[in-house]
Amino acid sequence: MAKERTIYMGPRLKRLRRELGLTQATMADDLEISPSYIALLERNQRPLTADLLLRLARTYRMD
C-alpha cells in the first residue's frame, strides 16, 4: 500500500490565483469548493489533495 505524502502549497496557490487575476471566491467556484477552503489552503491550514491538484491543472490548463 502506497504511503501518501502531505503537501502544503499555500503561498504557491495564492501566487497562482493572483497571477490569474482571480478572487478566492472565483477560484473556489471554478474548482467547486468553498472560498473558505481556498483561504485555508492558502494559509497552509489544509493540505492540497491529489484530486484538487488535478482539478487545478485541468481548470487552468497547467502542466
Residue spans for each PLM region:
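Short alpha-helical DNA-recognition segment
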Residues: 21-40, 55
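Short, conserved catalytic or interaction motifs in soluble domains
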Residues: 43
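A short, Lys/Arg-rich alpha-helix, primarily the initiator
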Residues: 1-20
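DNA major-groove recognition helix of helix-turn-helix/homeodomain DNA-binding modules
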Residues: 51-63
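Residue-level signal for the short linker/turn that defines the boundary of a DNA-recognition helix
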Residues: 11, 21-22, 48-51
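Short polybasic/polar patches that bind polyanions
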Residues: 14, 18, 29, 58
